[in-house]
Amino acid sequence: MKLSDSRTINADAATVWAGLLNPDVLKACVPGCTEMSGSAQDGFEATVVQKVGPVKATFKGAVALSDMNEPESLTMTGEGKGGAAGFAKGGADVRLEPQGDQTILHYDVEAKVGGKLAQLGSRIIDGFAKKMADQFFENFSDAVGAPVAQEGTPDSEDTSQKKGWFKKLVS
């Protein structure tokens, strides 16, 4: 399965980069993640509980980061095992493109699944992967970015109150 897309995040590239390397941010953003530990240098270990079609499983896995070119690009490779449900493994190439105060995050993912998951068929797996990616990037954008100002809305609030919680940490 292959998945490519890009997302505009309302934060500068350095903030987005820091978020991608922070296990607390990742835990908060990965749908169903119950545990996340490790570091960018040593890799991350995670536990994720998900339901894919009729199959519900707890996946335990590891993710390693390589080819890190701060704050422009990195490669993630990982594998997770979900017991009788099967396994998932794959990688992602991530590229950050600064656009003023915003960053466009481009990603190309290639993944393989096996076991009961593979028996569900590519339509269900591909739909699930797209849904997971959409949810992750929505959560990630909320965590590291400032909200986009609505046109016609009075901007009387203090802007520091509008920033995401991670941005408050690094500001």
Can you describe what each PLM-predicted range is?
Residues K116-E157:
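A conserved amphipathic terminal alpha-helix motif
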Residues G80-G127:
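Beta-strand/loop substructures that line and gate deep hydrophobic ligand-binding cavities in soluble
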Residues M1-G43, T47, K51, T153-S171:
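Hydrophobic ligand-binding cavity/cleft-lining segments
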Residues V52-K56, G114-I124, F128, E157-D158, ...:
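Alpha-helical membrane-targeting segments
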Residues S37-E79, Q135:
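Glycine-rich portal/gate segments that line the openings of hydrophobic small-molecule binding cavities
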Residues K2-S6, G43, T58-K60, S73, ...:
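Intrinsic-disorder/low-complexity, polar/charged segments enriched in Ser/Thr/Lys/Arg/Asp/Glu/Gln
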Residues V16-L20, L26, L65, Y107, ...:
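Hydrophobic pocket/interface hotspot
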Residues D5, T34, G61-D67, G78, ...:
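Hydrophobic/aromatic beta-strand elements that line small-molecule binding cavities or substrate pockets
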